[in-house]
Amino acid sequence: EVDIVVRKGKHVLVEGPNGIGKSTFIDAIANNTADGVTIGEGVRVGYYSQNFSTLDYNQTAYNCLLGVMDLKDEQVLRSTAASFLLDGKALSNEIGALSEGQKGLLQFARLVLMQPGLLILDEPTNHINFRHLPVIAEALDKFEGAMLLVSHVPDFVEQVRVDEKIDMKAV
């Protein structure tokens, strides 16, 4: 049993060996099916799933990004996409046609545009080119909302502020 309160600004690392249930645990939180877990009313949850299950593969990347924006602004959408190396060609493609790396970068752009209060990240370094990791780590480190992070990449985790850890072996 886990007893933890994750408030605005708190960054929590969920750790443990492969197969212990970290992804299942945070997926249940993200989908609001975890027993004993309550997400505050009105808190927008941004979920980065390592298997891209939150993406509609038949939708264009552009429409995926546009769909999460409260204020539809073409310039903001395109500049955010560009900051994650997604150009006009990538945006016009269906998500299913993107490379795994582009799908990962699309998820990050989507989270930026979504502006969540709670960010849940399941192995966000999977499929991402190692050259892009410092930029992503810096963005996560500066994230002002609450965050739950699962990562098996110590070099990446060291670059992100972690306020508390949940050891799944102890649960």
Across the structure, where does each feature detected by a protein language model lie?
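ABC ATP-binding cassette signature C-motif
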Residues: 1-171
